[in-house]
Amino acid sequence: MSRLTKQQILEQLKNGLIASCQPVDDGPMDSPEIVAAMAKASVIGGAAGLRIEGIDNLKAVRKVVDVPIVGIVKRDLPDSPVRITPFLQDIDDLYHAGADIIAFDGTDRVRPTTIEACARRIQELGAMSMADCSNYKEGMYCQELGVDLIGSTMSGYTGGETPDEPDVQLVRDLVASGCRVMAEGRYNTPELAAVAIENGAYAVTVGSALTRLEHIVSWFVTAIDDRKTGA
């Protein structure tokens, strides 16, 4: 398999939209064939890159697109809240399945594999790395380790109530400190995605608003229910 160089990946992603094609778990669209179709449609629509979860899904998508792919594996562990690419074997599997960028949880939480070990393994493989972080301190630490992209992915998801709006301030702060930032997390309208780029994000990832049909339909239904008259 021929691979894109780091420079080629960065050039393609600059100021671009990454479509996260992750259907609802065990839903009617949760199959590699449908994920591959989602991915192909996203690229036709102009997505600069894709974020794909799962080895089978990644293999199916890699066959039909040539844009950069951020690969992850999600797991539910009994002894750790970390879900995103928690093991070194996950990193190896993602690389061999065709991921150009391998994303892992960069939060400061109990975990089966250290952040340092994850970053080092990705570097050894020659892939690009992305750390899904929840705050400024985590992002800066991952940058010091040489991680290529710092994601705001986990902001609002490590405890307490999840805000409705994305954490644009975190993007600003990380950019101001020299990080190459992937804005991610609740960028669920075109306007919010544009705000991320305006505030210095290298690229922006959008997921549920593009590819989780169950969520999108429920947003419309809820809005209609809230405005019902004469019921």
Curated annotation (Swiss-Prot):
InterPro entries: Aldolase_TIM (IPR013785), NanE (IPR007260), RibuloseP-bd_barrel (IPR011060). GO terms for biological process: carbohydrate metabolic process; N-acetylmannosamine catabolic process; N-acetylneuraminate catabolic process. One of its GO terms (cellular component) is cytosol. Its EC number is 5.1.3.9. Keywords: Carbohydrate metabolism, Isomerase. One of its GO terms (molecular function) is N-acylglucosamine-6-phosphate 2-epimerase activity. Pathway: Amino-sugar metabolism; N-acetylneuraminate degradation; D-fructose 6-phosphate from N-acetylneuraminate: step 3/5. It comes from the Bacteria. Pfam families: NanE. It catalyses: an N-acyl-D-glucosamine 6-phosphate = an N-acyl-D-mannosamine 6-phosphate. It is an enzyme of class 5 (isomerase). Converts N-acetylmannosamine-6-phosphate (ManNAc-6-P) to N-acetylglucosamine-6-phosphate (GlcNAc-6-P). HAMAP family: ManNAc6P_epimer. Belongs to the NanE family. PANTHER family: N-ACETYLMANNOSAMINE-6-PHOSPHATE 2-EPIMERASE-RELATED. This is Putative N-acetylmannosamine-6-phosphate 2-epimerase. The lineage of its organism: Bacteria, Pseudomonadati, Pseudomonadota, Gammaproteobacteria, Pasteurellales.
